[in-house]
Curated annotation (Swiss-Prot):
HAMAP family: Pro_tRNA_synth_type1. Consists of three domains: the N-terminal catalytic domain, the editing domain and the C-terminal anticodon-binding domain. It is found in: Cytoplasm. The keyword ATP-binding applies. This is Proline--tRNA ligase. Catalyzes the attachment of proline to tRNA(Pro) in a two-step reaction: proline is first activated by ATP to form Pro-AMP and then transferred to the acceptor end of tRNA(Pro). As ProRS can inadvertently accommodate and process non-cognate amino acids such as alanine and cysteine, to avoid such errors it has two additional distinct editing activities against alanine. One activity is designated as 'pretransfer' editing and involves the tRNA(Pro)-independent hydrolysis of activated Ala-AMP. SUPFAM superfamilies: Class II aaRS ABD-related (SSF52954), Class II aaRS and biotin synthetases (SSF55681), YbaK/ProRS associated domain (SSF55826). It catalyses: tRNA(Pro) + L-proline + ATP = L-prolyl-tRNA(Pro) + AMP + diphosphate. Signal peptide: none annotated. Homodimer. Belongs to the class-II aminoacyl-tRNA synthetase family. ProS type 1 subfamily. It comes from Actinobacillus pleuropneumoniae serotype 7 (strain AP76). The keyword Secreted does not apply.
Length: 571
């Protein structure tokens, strides 16, 4: 491709509204342009990268035995009503009515559509297992689109769905897809972790997220220093450390009128925060136990996903308001504790091993100090309620935990029969009876992968694509003052024709621009291999080569250039 015949839309300045690096660089590199909130036009440089990512995904999915299909973005409401998600999905589901007064949605996902398709096309257990995938546009009406294509309303996703006679068959395909995803992200050159995850609104049992490690990520990824354990922080088990020590002091009731938070209590009374507990009141799962107390160490954070899975706690988790708490317990939120508490309590594992701790007295403006289990108050039910922290023991007993930020680029689920049962998707089993199919689903955010690669691989000059396979161009020909030098022009044109004939994705900068502008643009869009052709070097039989990824520069003999590029260009 010649730049003179290309829409080369680079920007010198960073747009003010771009918050994260990937958004800034995708705008500056001329990859995307905003159209409306969370909606983007993909320009030629961007679409080249997007299609290359899609092709890698497609190749690896095909190798894993999946079969490509394509389903409509527009979906009839009846399917969502049949699955039960019409009322459950929330405002992210964009609903509309066609000219015939029929309800439709713009698909945020395709579980309903694929289940309907397969129940119509597959009738016998002999046709299973079956794994179908598509690469298709999705729409989720995000309340706050942000970070460019990282969290946009319209995006491209690869979603696959597998159908099975039983869970054992599902597990086999799930394991294959786990490996396929690992192959995809390895081939893309990304530093990622596959982590245990919560299934969320999709439903099902087992689930893994594929997280690209980046400081701009929205998720906390937990992994061990000495094993392959990795989990989303929502699912990482917090292991209690040590044994409960014997009491060393008598319990005291202390006036604390100005201490309404843990931090105020610690500051005013010079207490170690790890010797305090906080009591949170949430809605209970039943009318008989309408409020439940969750008790954590003062420096720990509640893990809401863990808490709402407890049978006593309402799902989704909902905190009680102050009026409810005051009416039931008789004290405000700043004075709550485990002594004389008249609602069921669940304490975190770390609280169960505490001794001589401080807590609210359930009397406004008062706290108990030096509280001990069994001696001063009976031990309530113990559960894992908190987020892990850096340095906690790994749940598998190997090493300690590290926590890094991650960008979720893929997610695989074992759905089970949630959708097939609701939508009566059955086949004839080997006994001749109807058999509800067991399902799995497997998603990759294709547009998000592009942004995640940039978040992880960039410098002050622009994008550094982690793999030649996804760079918009793999080789840039940058001729110095070509329009004033016949020898430079002749060699550049000949090299361009040769590389094109060899199938190399090459960009030839034939603009009448200053060399500095040409270098800056090629570095900004991240072309991995740059061939710089100057009149003086050419006369000496040499060509300058620059590697974008390593920063290396070297002189190559003119007659060795093609062999050098063949050896070093990976795509």
């Amino acid at each position: 491709m010649r730049t003179s015949q290309y829409l080369f839309s680079t920007l010198k300045e960073t747009p003010n509204d771009a918050q994260v690096v990937s958004h800034q660089l995708m705008l500056r590199a001329g990859m995307i342009r905003p159209m409306a909130s969370g909606l983007y036009n993909w320009l030629p440089t961007g679409i080249k990268v997007l299609k290359k990512v899609e092709n890698i995904i497609r190749e690896e999915m095909n190798k894993g035995g999946a079969i490509e299909v394509l389903m409509p973005v527009v979906q009839p409401a009846e399917l969502w009503q049949e699955s039960g998600r019409w009322n459950d999905y929330g405002a992210e589901l964009l609903r509309f009515v066609d000219r015939g007064s029929r309800d439709f949605v713009l698909g945020p996902t395709h579980e309903e559509v694929i289940t309907d398709l397969v129940r119509r096309e597959v009738s016998s257990y002999k046709q299973l297992p079956l794994n179908l995938y598509q690469i298709q546009t999705k729409f989720r009406d995000e309340v706050r689109p942000r970070f460019g294509v990282m969290r946009s309303r319209e995006f491209v996703m690869k979603d696959a769905y597998s159908f099975h006679v039983d869970k054992a068959s599902l597990q086999e395909t799930y394991d294959v897809m786990y490996q396929v995803y690992s192959n995809i992200f390895t081939r893309l050159g990304l530093d990622f972790r596959a982590v245990q995850a919560d299934t969320g609104s999709i439903g099902g049992s087992a689930s893994h997220e594929f997280q690209v490690l980046a400081s701009s990520g929205e998720d906390d990824v937990v992994f061990s220093t000495e094993s392959d354990f990795a989990a989303n922080i929502e699912l990482a088990e917090a292991v209690a450390v040590g044994e409960r020590q014997a009491p060393t002091a008598e319990m005291q009731l202390v006036d604390t009128p100005n201490a309404k938070t843990i931090n105020e209590l610690v500051e005013q009374f010079n207490l170690p925060i790890e010797k305090t507990v906080k009591t949170l009141i949430v809605k209970g799962a039943t009318e008989e136990q309408s409020l439940v107390a969750l008790v954590l160490r003062g420096d720990h954070e509640l893990n809401e996903i863990k808490a709402q899975k407890h049978p006593l706690v309402a799902d989704p988790l909902e905190f009680a308001d102050e009026a409810e708490i005051k009416a039931k317990i008789g004290a405000g939120v700043g004075s709550l504790g485990v002594i004389n508490l008249n609602v069921p309590a669940i304490i975190d594992r770390s609280v169960a091993v505490m001794s001589d701790f401080g807590c609210g007295a359930n009397i406004d403006g008062r706290h108990y100090f030096n509280v001990n289990w069994e001696r001063d108050v009976a031990m309530p039910e113990v559960a894992d309620l908190r987020n892990v922290v850096e340095g906690d023991p790994s749940p598998d007993g190997k090493g300690v935990l590290q926590i890094k930020r991650g960008i979720e680029v893929g997610h695989i689920f074992q759905l089970g029969t949630k959708y097939s049962e609701a939508m009566k998707a059955t086949v004839q089993g080997d006994d001749g009876k109807p058999l509800v199919m067991t399902m799995g689903c497997y998603g990759i955010g294709v547009t998000r992968v592009v942004a995640a690669a940039i978040e992880q691989h960039h410098d002050e000059r622009g994008i550094i694509w982690p793999s030649d396979e996804i760079a918009p161009f793999t080789v840039a020909i940058v001729p110095m003052n070509m329009h004033k030098s016949e020898s430079v022009q002749q060699f550049s044109e000949e090299l361009y024709r040769t590389l094109k004939a060899q199938g190399v994705d090459v960009i030839f900068d034939d603009r009448k621009e200053r060399p500095g502008v040409m270098f800056a643009d090629m570095e900004l869009i991240g072309v991995p291999h740059m061939v710089v052709i100057g009149e003086k070097n050419l006369a000496n039989g040499e060509i300058e080569y620059k590697n974008r990824r390593t920063g290396e520069k070297q002189m190559i003999a003119k007659d060795q250039l093609l062999a050098f590029l063949k050896e070093n260009v990976k795509a």
